[in-house]
Amino acid sequence: MSLKHFIQITKPGIIFGNVLSVAGGFFLASKGNIDFGVFLAAVIGTSLVVASGCVFNNCIDRDIDQRMERTRNRVLVQGLVSLKLALLYATLLGIAGVALLYTEANPLAALFAVIGFVIYVGFYSLYLKRRSVHGTLVGSLSGAMPPVIGYCAVSNSFDFAALTLLVMFSLWQMPHSYAIAIFRFNDYRAAKIPVLPVQRGILVTKRHILLYILAFLVATLMLTVGGYAGLNYLAVAAGMGMYWLYMAWKGYKAVDDTVWARKLFVFSIFTITALSVMMSVDFQVTKELLVTYAF
């Protein structure tokens, strides 16, 4: 047991991805008027809650992880950290994260962190992941919470922009997750996890991927339509979304589904990263703020 093991069970890669989306939502709402104290609270608080959820997920999935090639060497599967200690660690991380968001950001940001945690750990990890093909859809809601937390940490309100972020990031999660399920098909089948490719076949999954990316593309444009993001954001969102849609369409002619799914997965990360960056720098400033800056 070492510090490295405690870091590994928090899934740092997932935390880093969520930090980018928190920042995107935060800077979108800030419109150039940045409170760095609140920003750090939003980023650190959300990271702690996400880390807590990941540790709980590792605890819950020990039996599944033993059957999957890519997860059989995880810390808890190997017994490098005890289950009791991991549960305590996860609990402390979660409490610290929610407390930080509540006290240094606002109660609304903390509420969305709790909602995301409950969906991920309670509904997805404990139940739906093992029992329903719709587990991915429900789990996608938890993955969409970080940008909403970042946005609400500034705005302290759930408005059209916050709703758009929730819908947009939820829709993004679906083809992203389905791509993983395709190139990790044998692992999911061995672990008896009822993901869409295993339950209904890869061809059906390709159709779902195409439809979700199309819906995602439309949702991303709503930030500009609603007057929250600028034309540069719109251009990047449209360009990335259409190319991702084109890649999904090419899947119908793919010779090797595993290779195609990996490419789709990698591009999904580029897409959401680009949009998080663009909404951070190309926000729409209201007329009232422009007058304030002018004087």
Swiss-Prot record:
Gene Ontology terms: cellular component: plasma membrane
Gene3D superfamilies named among the record's database cross-references: UbiA prenyltransferase (1.10.357.140)
Please state the pathway this protein functions in, per its UniProt record.
Porphyrin-containing compound metabolism; heme O biosynthesis; heme O from protoheme: step 1/1
Topology class, membrane: Multi-pass membrane protein
BP GO terms, sorted? heme O biosynthetic process
Localization recorded for this chain is: Cell inner membrane
Protein name as it appears in the record:
Protoheme IX farnesyltransferase
